[in-house]
Regions:
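Mixed-charge, Lys/Arg-rich low-complexity intrinsically disordered regions
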Residues: 1-15
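A short, compositionally biased
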Residues: 9-12, 40-44
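Short beta-strand-centered aromatic/proline hotspots
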Residues: 21-36
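Short, exposed beta-strand/loop patches in secreted or surface proteins that constitute
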Residues: 38-39, 56
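Intrinsically disordered, low-complexity, charged/polar segments
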Residues: 44-71
Length: 71
C-alpha cells in the first residue's frame, strides 16, 4: 500500500486505510494553515469517516495507507 509523503498530498474524499479499517478523508488540518472559518491548528491531523458515519482522528498522516483500488 502507498503512503503519503506530506499532509499536503491528502485530499478530501481520499479512500484510506487506518488501523486496518477503511475510511474516507473528511477534513485535513495542516499545522499553521488557517481554514475558512479562521481556525489554525497547532498540529497536523486528519479526520476520517467510515461507512457507518463514525469519525476517527488520525494525528500522524504517515499511518494512513492509500487504498489501491481507489488510486
Amino acid at each position: 500500500m502507498n503512503t503519503y509523503d506530506s499532509p499536503y498530498q491528502i485530499g478530501l474524499g481520499d479512500s484510506v486505510n487506518y488501523n486496518f479499517k477503511n475510511y474516507l478523508v473528511l477534513i485535513n488540518y495542516i499545522k499553521g494553515e488557517t481554514d475558512a472559518k479562521g481556525y489554525t491548528p497547532k498540529s497536523n491531523r486528519t479526520i476520517l469517516i467510515d461507512n457507518d458515519d463514525n469519525r476517527v482522528v488520525c494525528d500522524d498522516f504517515t499511518k494512513l495507507r492509500i487504498n489501491e483500488e481507489a488510486a
